[in-house]
Amino acid sequence: ACTLTPMKTSKAAWKDIFEIALDDLASLVCPRRIVYCEGRDAPGAGGSEKGLDAQVFNNIFSDSFHDTLFVSSGGNTELDQRSDIAIAIFSKIFSELEVLVLKDRDMASGRNTTEQDRVLYLQNNADYHRVLKRWEIENYLYDKEVLTKYCEDKGLVFNEESYDELVNDIENQNLKDVTSRIKSICGITSSINPERFKLNLSEYITEDMAVYNDLASCIFR
């Protein structure tokens, strides 16, 4: 015969119960890696992701890193605060979950940030920090390789000469402010939504491209 006795209500006991109950299910509902990045933190309908950067990263890496989820967490300051809270909470529930913090290289409140500054930042912060090598996400989306591929697929004429005159430093140049000129270089004459345009471009970044490997090396090292 087996005698049942009440469980002692301790944190350790509850942890054991959740590990047993969620063992297989947790791997299905919880990603192996969450990457917090800059962007609009308020969710859309049904909790959908509204931050541009997170949507772009999820588009690019959903196939090759299917167990990774990118989540927008506000601006630079909010990103640090919320990621610290997330790491503290998730590490107690999902021991196998990795949480990373990804920042644009323009993290110094508009001041110029060099590659050396980026390296120093990473050397002097926790290992879960990541910083883009290029200035911000537009410097990847507006890469010549991406725009050429997009134009070829859409039957548009890419003006390479105009592009080379405009983009002289793909890593450090502020390209977010020249979206309308990028659109013209791609031969787009109609009115388009800038955010939708960027999301569409992200669909053309694939594993066989140099820009993909450049971006992936910043995150999955």
Label every PLM stretch briefly:
Residues 1-27, 210-214, 221:
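Switch/communication elements of ASCE P-loop NTPase nucleotide-binding domains
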